[in-house]
């Protein structure tokens, strides 16, 4: 018979971490996976206006100038705010309906044809109803 082998004892891990890539950095997609969902939930909870006030007021004044033949009208801040609230509510409702059409078509991306069909279904006025 030959010499007996020593039984192997499991090695202990060092108490300090070994330098090298961490486990989290090896999977960068895991963290970004639900960022879009987190952003959607944050925006749904908020009641803030999403359009900037100054560019919106410029567009309102430009459109108003076309209808009044160049006469510059003064707008109250509350009137602009009410108009912006209505415009954002209209756009949110439009995109909700367009997204339903997108899901019906078996897609997740809204195409211009979805917006056009939404407006056509709503009719000429196309209000919030």
Swiss-Prot record:
User: Could you tell me which residues carry Phosphoserine?
Assistant: 16, 22, 57
Post-translational events = Trimethylated by NTMT1 at the N-terminal glycine after cleavage of Met-1. Methylation is low before incorporation into nucleosomes and increases with cell cycle progression, with the highest levels in mitotic nucleosomes. Phosphorylated by CDK1 at Ser-57 during early mitosis; this abolishes association with chromatin and centromeres, prevents interaction with HJURP and thereby prevents premature assembly of CENPA into centromeres. Dephosphorylated at Ser-57 by PPP1CA during late mitosis.
Chief localization:
nucleus
Intracellular or extracellular location(s): Nucleus; Chromosome, Centromere
Region CATD: which residues? Answer: 64-105
N,N,N-trimethylglycine (modified residue): where? 2
Q: Which CDD domains match?
A: HFD_H3 (cd22911)
- GO BP term, example: mitotic cytokinesis
Chain intervals with Basic residues compositional bias: 1-14
Where is the region Disordered? 1-30
| Organism domain of life | Eukaryota
Gene3D superfamilies according to UniProt:
Histone, subunit A (1.10.20.10)
| Any GO MF annotation of the entry | protein heterodimerization activity
UniProt entry keywords in alphabetical sequence: ADP-ribosylation, Centromere, Chromosome, DNA-binding, Methylation, Nucleosome core, Nucleus, Phosphoprotein
Q: Which Pfam family is an annotated match for this chain, by its short name?
A: Histone
Q: Where is this region: H3-like?
A: 30-129
What Gene Ontology terms describe where this protein resides (cellular component)?
CENP-A containing nucleosome; condensed chromosome, centromeric region; nucleoplasm; pericentric heterochromatin
Per the record, the domain comment is: The CATD (CENPA targeting domain) region is responsible for the more compact structure of nucleosomes containing CENPA. It is necessary and sufficient to mediate the localization into centromeres.
Q: Which PANTHER family match?
A: CENTROMERE PROTEIN A, HISTONE H3.2
The free-text function statement in the UniProt record for this protein reads: Histone H3-like nucleosomal protein that is specifically found in centromeric nucleosomes. Replaces conventional H3 in the nucleosome core of centromeric chromatin that serves as an assembly site for the inner kinetochore. The presence of CENPA subtly modifies the nucleosome structure and the way DNA is wrapped around the nucleosome and gives rise to protruding DNA ends that are less well-ordered and rigid compared to nucleosomes containing histone H3. May serve as an epigenetic mark that propagates centromere identity through replication and cell division.
Q: How does it assemble?
A: Component of centromeric nucleosomes, where DNA is wrapped around a histone octamer core. The octamer contains two molecules each of H2A, H2B, CENPA and H4 assembled in one CENPA-H4 heterotetramer and two H2A-H2B heterodimers. CENPA modulates the DNA-binding characteristics of nucleosomes so that protruding DNA ends have higher flexibility than in nucleosomes containing conventional histone H3. Inhibits binding of histone H1 to nucleosomes, since histone H1 binds preferentially to rigid DNA linkers that protrude from nucleosomes.
Q: Which family does it belong to?
A: Belongs to the histone H3 family.
Q: What is this protein called?
A: Histone H3-like centromeric protein A
Organism name: Cricetulus griseus (Chinese hamster)
